[in-house]
């Protein structure tokens, strides 16, 4: 690293220019600052892209109306802004001048904007900056206008994260200066999506109109393509809706649906056999019922006969006993034909019932 002595020795031959021609001084200052930043780009870590925003220029420029203090005062309010915003604030103020670098190069002039692009008040304060040039060459201080001019031009130099200027053609100033999220250009950019969204909103409306216009001829085409239905056939293709208005039984007389004579005779025979079998079952049931009835009557008759054979009878020949008999005894007396019994039995023993 160079010492301030060698740097001052190297710059002894330079003479401050007259206030009438301040553009050469500004060019030399910007060239020095640019070549100072080039050898240190590889050594320093990259800072976030929002640190070197153009919004910092009005704060550090000597002609800025936003700063109440003068540029040469070095107020403590302005130093924290320089330390936090610009990458040069972290460097030693004694390292502002490069070592063994030419004072001007074509690449540096391509990257430098014209003096007309600066603020209008910056040209008024150039005379003061030129008057203090010898002091800044000997011993630069962080509060002097030389240091402020370097920091102001440092905002125009390429960012440490960007490539160093080379033989390629230079990019526009807007691309070289990094943008910060709070910069006025970034504030104007969010308004672009709504502007881009407005055509998007208007886009579907013509499509709908085109679709509606396309649907109109499309709706006419099917009407024209409908085939003509031949006379005698229904529109829906249902055969039972014929123009002749015949009955369904007459329309469905197909050959597969007709039954043969043998099939008809067979079905008739089956029906007859079923009826005969049902009649036979009824007759069998009636026969069983009659047989049961006869058995019951025979059983009754046989029981009565057995009772008569087993009873003891007494024939009452004296009618006076009947008169003297009580009602209970008269209930048990019956009149019977005893002729058969008398014939079977001997006459000395007549049949009587007690």
Swiss-Prot record:
GO terms for cellular component: nucleolus. Citrullinated by PADI4. Residues 31-44, 199-211, 267-289, 297-311 have a biased composition (Basic and acidic residues). InterPro entries: CCDC86 (IPR026570), Cgr1-like (IPR005579). It comes from Bos taurus (Bovine). Residues 97-107 have a biased composition (Polar residues). This is Coiled-coil domain-containing protein 86. It is found in: Nucleus; Chromosome; Nucleus, Nucleolus. The modification Phosphothreonine is found at residue 60. Pfam families: Cgr1 (PF03879). The modification Citrulline is found at residue 336. Residues 274-317 form a coiled coil. Residues 1-354 are annotated as: Disordered. The modification Phosphoserine is found at residues 18, 24, 47, 53, 61, 64, 75, 86, 105, 108, 123, 183, 212-213. Keywords: Chromosome, Citrullination, Coiled coil, Nucleus, Phosphoprotein. Required for proper chromosome segregation during mitosis and error-free mitotic progression. Residues 232-248, 320-330 have a biased composition (Basic residues). Its main location: nucleus. The keyword Nucleus applies. It comes from the Eukaryota. Residues 49-58 have a biased composition (Low complexity).
């Amino acid at each position: 690293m160079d010492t301030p002595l060698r740097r001052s020795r190297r710059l002894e031959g330079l003479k401050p220019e007259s206030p009438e021609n301040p553009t050469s001084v500004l060019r030399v200052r910007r060239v020095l600052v640019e070549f100072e930043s080039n050898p240190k780009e590889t050594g320093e870590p990259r800072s976030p892209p929002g640190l070197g925003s153009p919004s910092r220029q009005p704060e550090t420029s000597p002609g800025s109306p936003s700063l109440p203090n003068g540029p040469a005062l070095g107020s403590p309010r302005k130093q924290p802004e320089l330390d936090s915003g610009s990458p040069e604030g972290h460097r030693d103020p004694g390292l502002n001048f490069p070592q063994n670098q030419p004072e001007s190069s074509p690449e540096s002039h391509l990257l430098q904007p014209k003096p007309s692009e600066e603020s209008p008040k910056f040209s008024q304060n150039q005379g003061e900056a030129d008057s203090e040039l010898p002091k800044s060459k000997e011993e630069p201080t962080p509060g002097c206008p030389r240091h402020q001019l370097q920091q102001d031009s440092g905002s125009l130099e390429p960012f440490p994260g960007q490539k160093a200027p080379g033989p390629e053609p230079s990019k526009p100033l807007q691309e070289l200066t990094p943008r910060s999220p709070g910069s006025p250009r970034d504030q104007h950019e969010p308004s672009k999506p709504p502007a881009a969204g407005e055509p998007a909103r208007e886009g579907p409306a013509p499509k709908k109109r085109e679709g509606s216009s396309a649907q109109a001829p499309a709706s006419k085409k099917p009407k024209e393509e409908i085939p003509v239905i031949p006379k005698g056939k229904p529109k829906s293709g249902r055969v039972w809706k014929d123009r002749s208005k015949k009955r369904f039984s007459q329309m469905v007389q197909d050959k597969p649906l007709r039954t043969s004579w043998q099939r008809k005779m067979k079905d008739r025979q089956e029906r007859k056999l079923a009826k005969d079998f049902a009649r036979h079952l009824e007759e069998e049931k009636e026969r069983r019922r009659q047989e049961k009835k006869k058995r019951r009557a025979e059983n009754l008759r046989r029981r009565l006969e057995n009772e008569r054979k087993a009873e003891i009878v007494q024939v009452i020949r004296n009618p006076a006993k009947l008169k003297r008999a009580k009602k209970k005894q008269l209930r048990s007396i019956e009149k019977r034909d005893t002729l058969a019994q008398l014939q079977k039995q001997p006459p000395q023993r007549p049949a009587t019932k007690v």
